[in-house]
Amino acid sequence: DLGGATGLLGLAVIGDRPDRTGVLFDRFPPAVVEESISLMGLTDRTEVMCGNFMADRIGERYDLILALNVMLFAKGRMEELLKKCYDALNPGGVLLVISEAILPDHTGPWDMVMGYLPYYFQGMDMGVLKNEVSDAAVRVGFTKCEKRTECLCSGTQDIDIIRK
């Protein structure tokens, strides 16, 4: 779970099957997630890595990397992060990305554009453009990208299922 904050989504994936192990990666110190790991009974199957996913190693030999609402932190360096994910995945591995899906002319989706409007007024380039992730993923070597656009609890977002 890359940039997974409290790690709850990653823990849900790990805990879903007894044969799964996983890594939670974020800037938060391990103490932030250790109680959740313990309460879910996953201490022997979960590793916590702290750091900056843009600057630090993210690990290796993963079958799945979750990158949920973190690609905006890679604006201007998206290929660099996607290459790092590509290199960290096993052959046939999957990178699951959820991002904002802002239209190139910034006219939609309305819920995402309105949420970022104060930042745009301040000249901040926030949000990931539609197809920005999938296009960059192909450029760094991923072989297949499946896209879905869904209304999630955080707004209308793209779900990219990207295969190595």
Place the predicted regions along the sequence by residue.
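Class I SAM-dependent methyltransferase SAM/SAH-binding core
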Residues: 7-53
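A short acidic, Gly/Pro-enriched loop at the edge of an enzyme's catalytic core
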Residues: 54-65
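A short SAM/SAH-binding and catalytic strip from SAM-dependent methyltransferases
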Residues: 63-77
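A short glycine-rich, Lys/Arg-flanked "PGG" loop and its adjoining helix->strand segment in the class I
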Residues: 79-91
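Conserved beta-strand signature within the Rossmann-like core of class I S-adenosyl-L-methionine
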Residues: 92-100
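Short, glycine-/aromatic-enriched active-site segment of Class I SAM-dependent methyltransferases
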Residues: 107-123
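Short alpha-helix
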Residues: 124-141
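Core SAM-dependent methyltransferase catalytic element
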Residues: 141-164
